[in-house]
Amino acid sequence: MQIFGVDIGGSGIKGAPVDLDKGDLAQERHKVLTPHPATPDAVADGVKQVVDHFGWSGPVGVTFPGVVTDGATIRTAANVDDGWIDTDARALLGERLGGLPVTVLNDADAAGVAEMHFGAGRGRTGTVILLTFGTGIGSALFVDGVLVPNTELGHLELDGHDAEKRASSKVREDHDMTWEHWAAHRVSKYLAHVEMLFSPELFIIGGGVSRKAHKFLPHIEGIKAEIVPAQLQNNAGIVGAAMRVAEH
């Protein structure tokens, strides 16, 4: 079975039909740049461009970088325009897509669902935390395979700031940090804080940096939990968005 998944990020909006039997993209994904400002109408236009690229006419799952309740309503919008707050994203996107059924969920939760079913978390019990490092830091918390939604651990305080302002991939790029310095001094400190709070058995590191895991994972220090890269890499959000549609 195929369902369409769209992943809205701080820098790009990407999507593709997903083969839910294999947990992989059925076609090469299509990406457009996230508009700035990333207002609801502008982002909805971007989602429509991605869906229209494939001529898709069925249900669509969409991820969003913030807290999402009831599969529809946006409650926070850290890396997009504040106009999203309290927006019914399901209604907005459904209207923009000509009435197609739409389901919306947090972006990291979507990636986590995909990794737990098809990727690095498959078959794992206990406490598992997926963290996506990109424009910000997203999180998905699982206890014995069950998702605790909308944890948003990128907004924990670290050195007096939101953690994602200290340890995201964007921070590494903006400050021209080496992979080693970023891992040893920023990511390690952040993971230690999360580990103190939740004592997970496993950290899964996702987002775009998962493709470069060999450059930074060996330099993460002082963490008791196992740390592995996401297997679905940066397609996990698209796959998880499609999976959520199939659950409803």
PLM region spans:
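Asparagine-centered polar/low-complexity signal
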Residues: 77-80, 106, 234
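Anion-binding (especially nucleotide phosphate/pyrophosphate-binding) glycine-rich loop
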Residues: 85-100, 108
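Active-site glycine-centered loops adjacent to acidic/histidine catalytic or metal-binding residues
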Residues: 107, 134, 241
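Short acidic loop-to-helix transition motifs that present clustered carboxylates
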Residues: 109-113
